[in-house]
Amino acid sequence: MDEKELIERAGGPVTRGRLVRDLEALGVGAGDTVMVHTRMSAIGYVVGGPQTVIDAVRDAVGADGTLMAYCGWNDAPPYDLAEWPPAWREAARAEWPAYDPLLSEADRGNGRVPEALRHQPGAVRSRHPDASFVAVGPAAHPLMDDHPWDDPHGPDSPLARLAGAGGRVLLLGAPLDTLTLLHHAEARAEAPGKRFVAYEQPVTVGGRRVWRRFRDVDTSRGVPYGRVVPEGVVPFTVIAQDMLAAGIGRTGRVAAAPVHLFEAADVVRFGVEWIESRMGGAAGGA
């Protein structure tokens, strides 16, 4: 889509001031801690790109507010590295650079904003190579510090801290299936057959690059949703739609983008109850 189409879709160029007004009308306010998921093209033609989006959200939350996003690691070793032919695997492992919170690029699949956010002055990125988050603002260190190596979406994760601190989640043109906070609900929920994964990634420990083994709920297929979600449908979309139907969250528009604003604690509570009520309740494992 070219610039003219994007401008026409939003009824004009999307400026920082326009974004701030729309965010404030939605209910984003001073002192908020907000995790944002963004699809830039849905907003329209944003004058200044991701930096303008970041500036606008920070304007809306003010000096006492904090902006958070999910990064991941764009160049992380693939989960199937152990299945590579031995010669290939060992050659890669011998020189694969360790994850560096300051240098390692955010996963491009998460959009442009996380990568831009991690470059902001004062940005704090969590230490987990596979599930890193980034935050800017007074709550950045409390949210990011000492991200647990194992169960990085579970208790004491940045997601758990977000919910515990009264944080919010903003889907700014991003689809409902990007609601990463629901992985925390998956980690907490007791569900028979819940699957876990173990994998290795290079990190720096004591000044040395080491391959560390991690354990986490399988964020691709950790909960056996197939019994209750039709094939081809993203489970998070169904959960989020049910959540909205239950009156949880606010819906509006920011420029051309459809937006949703959720209280993080409400998302976690609803997600856990949704999973447990449909999966049978008793804890399972793998």
Curated annotation (Swiss-Prot):
GO biological process, one term: response to antibiotic
Highest taxon of the lineage: Bacteria
Enzyme class: transferase
UniProt EC number: 2.3.1.81
Molecular functions (GO terms): aminoglycoside 3-N-acetyltransferase activity
InterPro entries: Amioglycoside_AcTrfase (IPR003679), Antibiotic_NAT-like (IPR028345)
Pfam families referenced in this protein's UniProt entry, alphabetically: Antibiotic_NAT (PF02522)
Catalytic activity: a 2-deoxystreptamine antibiotic + acetyl-CoA = an N(3)-acetyl-2-deoxystreptamine antibiotic + CoA + H(+)
Matches recorded under SUPFAM superfamilies: TTHA0583/YokD-like
Entry keywords, A to Z: Acyltransferase, Antibiotic resistance, Transferase
Reported function: Resistance to neomycin.
Family: Belongs to the antibiotic N-acetyltransferase family.
Listed NCBIfam families: AAC_3, AAC_3_VIII
Protein name (record): Aminoglycoside N(3)-acetyltransferase VIII
Source taxonomy: Bacteria, Bacillati, Actinomycetota, Actinomycetes, Kitasatosporales
